[in-house]
Amino acid sequence: MLGTGTPRLNPDRSGPSTAIVVGDRAYLIDFGPGVVRRAAAAARKGFPALEPPKISVAFLTHLHSDHTAGYPDLILSPWVFGREKLDVYGPEGTEEMTQHLLMAYRRDIEIRTNGMEKKPPLVVHAHDVRPGVVYKDDRVTVKAFAVPHGEWPQAFGYRFETPDRVIVISGDTSPSDELVANCQPCDVLIHEVQLPSYNVETMPDWPAYRARYHTTTDQLAELANRAKPGLLVGYHNGGTEEALRDILQQIQRTYRGRVVVARDLDVF
């Protein structure tokens, strides 16, 4: 779990980003603020596949800024230190965002390739994808499925099938029957979760917003009882340690399976 936070400016919780590591390869999902340095930290903790120049395949669940603000860093920094190419898969708009970022950093890229550094060309292949199998290699098969996230016309969850595990990641979503179907079966479900009281003081319309965009503790417990993952991992919450304990306790009121609430750099 590279980043488990929200748009809240919590220095202990980077923006949403998850890595699936299969042997010597890492597959990145979402690029919240701080993603590249969190990957470097994970590499130091025993996951060399997460050395940033080695990350070459990545996926976006949707294009909210808290999930994409680290994208320029992911494009540029690993390239500066030797990455050969990057393939990025995501909903409609991923290609457009990538093109605009490359244009925004055009002068930097030109100086690094044509100046004294003599960097090789920056190669980024962005792919707008639709639900279904979007990526496959000899380690993993990745399936995208649609999830409901407010006004976003496309938001995805992903199902990763590896030789020994099936991992499902929700992205941002309100409760989703499609997600439950994609957990049949799954070893690990990584799902966003929000306290019902989160943001109420500063955002009076939060309950209405949350109902369309996110999943509460009680809703996640109900969903997990249907999905039956081997392990449920809650993420994408920006609260204090007390809030994390509250989230766990509220889920456990009605869900008896294995469940944890993730912190940055946790490993499962």
What are these regions (language model features)?
Residues 1-168, 246-268:
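Binuclear metal-dependent hydrolase catalytic cores
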Residues 157, 164-166, 174-266:
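Cap/insert and terminal regions of metallo-dependent hydrolase folds
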